[in-house]
Every structure is written in structure tokens, then in C-alpha cells.
Amino acid sequence: MKTADELLEGTFISNKKGFGFVRVDGIDYDFFIPANKTRGAFHDDKVLIRPLDESEMYGERRNRRRSGTVKKLSEASVEKILERGLKTVVGVYQKNKKFGFVIPDNSRIDSDIFIPGRFENGAKSGDRVVVELTSYGDKVRSAEGKIIEVIGDYTDPLTDVLSVVRELKIPYEFPEEVTADLKRIPDEVDPRELATRTDLRDLVTVTIDGEDAKDLDDAITLYEENGMYKLGVHIADVSHYVTENSPLDKEALNRGTSCYLVDKVIPMLPEKLSNGICSLNAGKDRLTLSCLMDIDKNGNIVSHKICESVINVNERMTYTAVSAIVEDRDPETMERYSELVPLFDLMLEVSDLLREKRRQRGSIDFDFDESKIVVEDGKVSYIGAYERRRSNGIIEDFMLAANETIAEDYFWQELPFEYRVHEAPDAEKVKQLGVLISKFGFYFKASRDNVHPKEFQKLIDSISGSECENMVSRMTLRTMKQAKYSTECTGHFGLACRYYCHFTSPIRRYPDLMIHRIIKENIRGKLNDNRQKHYNAILPKICDDNSKKERRAESAEREVEKLKKVEYMSEHVGEVFQGVISGVNNRGIFVELENTVEGFVSVADMYDDFYCYSEEEYAMIGETGHNKYSIGDKVTVKVAKTDKLTKSIDFVIKMKEGEESHGKGKRRQAHRK
């Protein structure tokens, strides 16, 4: 337990209202920083904090802590700013006569940035810009900066992606040294390399990906022999071309992962590699790292071999085509791929076995709608729920099997390695989830200090097909901790497995590339004591960096998706949609539409009654008419307005009579404990 005299180092997370939080590595909760104790800290600063004792806390928060509603020692004061986290800020410029302000895109930054006229760099009002901070402000003065890049008009959809990329400091263009390094990369496989590898070109080999995918980094072989399924997962040997500490390798580490931003991809590796020599294109000899598994009729992986190999893909398949065969039995598709139909049927058979094996041990399979966003000529033309077909699951099952097999192999060899780990959820969050889902008649078992993933699996099974399936699945997912990379093999809670790593996507993930390098050195007998010491020294930092870069990419993907949804709904203001209440707080109601777009209904716009938020029922309840809006309720809403600056969509609820509530007057909000 941390004492109030102990100083801790962490990252400051600001809030528009002036207060903030500090996240400290190794502590599973954030420290609340009152507005009068931030010491001028700016969002993302590295700070030194001192936990407060009860006597230093504001009365209401002190009482809440005594009652157990907040964690002990969860409040602190900033004692020192160690390092400024943000050097630049992205936002929209508003020009006055002799100066201007930039309204930050990041809603956590609690003040606009003052721009002296001489530093506007040709920006016009309404331009989205990048500002270099020259002063971080204080209690009386705003932060100050100078404009170093004009991205474009904030209403232009083409500026959306670039603004998010600049805000999160995601590398966009490849530096010159990387371009120069590409000159050594061949267009075809060197025939001399083939002699040293296991030749698998005679096996019928397929890739299965989305229609638009170009970076094909995994291929599958499968056949039966001596009562065993012979499953081969073949992964592009990226490490053969991206050598350690080369410019390509350093830039790949810097990026950490490819970033998929709706209709644009920011790749981890240049196209010459990702779409060229490393992509497992049909009819081309390709260097691979293969995990060859023998699976019995009960779905047990009884033996395996990991080897450097060469393959030649027979057919580049799509999820749509494979599903048309194994699910729809579409005559035309089956005729076209008649020679491969038995292979796909066998794949489905083995996939079902592997999936059932995971289900028996308690692996959690979340099934909620993801968004499919179609962009045509720079504008969003369609948003809807992404249809997940059985063929997606086939590839997922095979990749999981390879990842687990590789991780277990290297764990028992006691070699330095990068694992993918997922810790059990926090007991308090599990308790809160249990209370929430009980309102919908669902329950799951959890002891005070322990919960098994199988209980979550049972919950997901119990809500399958129900109207609240999508919503409860999301609530359950939010209860989980984030998976991360680690040198310690501590298991994966969500998959209910002891050993796990990321092996199958080295074109788009650096951790996969990292362990390919280790595996190949081990296969070749070059992983001697010195090399093991080398990896033991560098892997902890690389794991931490990979985890941070993954979170950065996920943030970018979320932000761009928000922007595209706002852009799309701005064309539908005034239109009526069906939705489900996905969240409630004292400010209003969140509603998710059938097309996966989420918007907000402010309690101030609910004129038919005086509404109070009930914490006990997670509902907004009318005081006079007894109207009640709870999570999971179906509602009809009208799109009231959208705002690209705040990335927000506002709805108003249509009343039961088919009319939206009207009228004016003072709205009263209250808490019902």
C-alpha cells in the first residue's frame, strides 16, 4: 500500500473542468488530482505526485472514501512536472484581428492555445492546424504556441485522417533512409535460399482474406494422414528481409503496428515489402516460417514442428467466397472452386474441433456488431454492422492454434521471448458488471477475489440471440483489462490459455516480427548465451513500446471512426432512426442505432417530464409521469445536430405517441441513490 509520504511518477491526464488524473505504472487505478493541486500540469505531462491523506481532501470526497465508494489513497497532488508530454497540438484555428486561438481536437486539453498574429503562418479561420507549444500557461494565462502546419479546412473530410495522425504523432511518410534501404530488397525470392528450407510447394495452399487485402501474411495447408489432421500455418518470413537494426527495422519498431483508418492504411512496412516480396501472393514462391501441427480427432494438438519453409499459394480466396462454399453451399461458387471444396469442408471440420476445445476450457468469444464504413470519393456512403461470416472464424481458429503452440514451445525452452498476456479483470469492476447485468435478469458466479473466464463465457452464451446481446457484450468487454506484450508468460484470461503470443502477422505487427527473429536464430543454432543476453536486455523495453504503439493505433482508429460517423450523420439531420439505449448517466442517455452509430440525448432536451438519474437502476426516471429509460430499451430518435469539432451526435427522443417532446422551461436534474 502506498503511503501519503511516498512520491510517485506518472502521466497527467487533464480534464476540461480543470481537474485531472495521474496514471502510474503498476497501479491499477488512477489518482484524482483536484483543480487546485495540478501545479500547472498540462495533458500528458510526466509528473511527480504525492498521495493525499484524508485530512487534505475536500469534505465530500473524504466522506465518499470513508464510505468505501472510492479507493483508498486515490487522491493526490502534483508536486513537480518532470517532463512536458505534448510538444505539439492539433486543432481548429479561430482568427481575430491581431491574434487567434486554436481549439484543440483533444477534448482533454482544458484551454485554447493563444496564437500571436506573427505566428499564424498563413492560417485562416476554420483551418485545422498543427501548433508547436511555446508556453504551457498558468492560472491566469492561456497556453501559447505557433502554427507550424496548416492541414486544411476542418470541414473537408480529407483532413480528418491527417489531423488524427498528427495529433497522435503517428509516422506517416517513410524517411529517406528507409527508402534507400528498400533498394536492397529483391522483387523475387533468391533461388539459393530455397535449398536451406523445408520445401512445401507441393502442398495445396490457400490464403483467405478480405476482398481488398493486399498484405497477405498467412497461408493454410490442411490434409488428413494416419488418423490425424495435418494443419500448416505458414507466415511470411518478414525477418529475412527486415534485418535487426536496419533502417527498415528501426522504422518498423517506431511505428509498432499498421494503422487501419477506415479507408486508409498507414503501414508498418513499405509497400514493396507488405504488398510485394513478403505478401503470400498466389503463384509466387515465398519464404515463410511454418508451424506444422498434428491434431487428433478430439481437437488436441499432439505434436508440432516449427521450420523455415518455402511455399507457393495455389489460390487467393476471400472470406465471402469461402463462406459461400461452407455456409451457403452456393452452386456457382462451389463449381468455380470445385477442386478446393473438400479442403474448405475439412477446414470447417477442424475449426469446429479447435473452437469447441477452447469453449470447454472457458475461452470468451465476444460477438457484437463492429462498424462497416464505406467511403466513396472521399465521402462516407454507407455505415452498417459488419457481417462476420464463418470463414473469418476458420482463419481465427487456425491462427490462435499456431500462436498458442509457438508460445508454449518457447516457454518450456526457457528462452527470451515476447508473449501476449491478458490479466484477470479487477474484482471491483466484475462486481459492478454483476450488479448491472442483474437488472436484465442475467447472472454469473464470481468469488470475492477470483473469477474464471468460463463464467464470462456462460454469460455471453446466455445473452446470445437476446435483444441486449450487443450491449451486454460491450459492457462485459469494458470490464476486461487491456491485453499487452510482456517477457513474462502469465497467460491470457480472455482465451483461457496458459501460453500465448503473436506470431501470425509480422507484416503489420512488430511483436510478431520480433519473435520470428528469435525463432529463426534458435532453429539455426545461433541463439547462444550472448544473443540470449542481448534479447533479455532489449525485450522488456520493446514489449512496453509495442503495447503503447498498439494503444496509439487503436486510439487513431477509434477517432477516425467517430469522425466518419459524424460526417455521415450530418447528412441525416432531421431524420428518424430506431435505436437501443446503450448507456445512461446524470447528463442524459446514449443511444446506439441499428447502423452502429451512437449519439446522445441530453436530459435538458427531454421536455415531457422532470427526469432524475437513478444509480441503482441505471435508468433515467420521470418524476411525474413515471416514464423510465433504461439500458437496453428500444427507442425512436431524431438526429438533432452533429458537431465535427467535438465529434458528437445529438438525438432527441420521439415520444410514444410518435411525437418528439416539445416545450421550454427549467429542467431539474437530481440523483436518486
Annotate the PLM regions.
Residues 1-232, 239-285, 323, 619-620, ...:
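Charge-lined substrate channels and their catalytic hotspots, especially those that engage the 3′ end
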Residues 29-34, 109-115, 597-614, 665:
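A short macromolecule-binding patch
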Residues 130, 135-137, 163-166, 170, ...:
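Electropositive polyanion-binding surfaces
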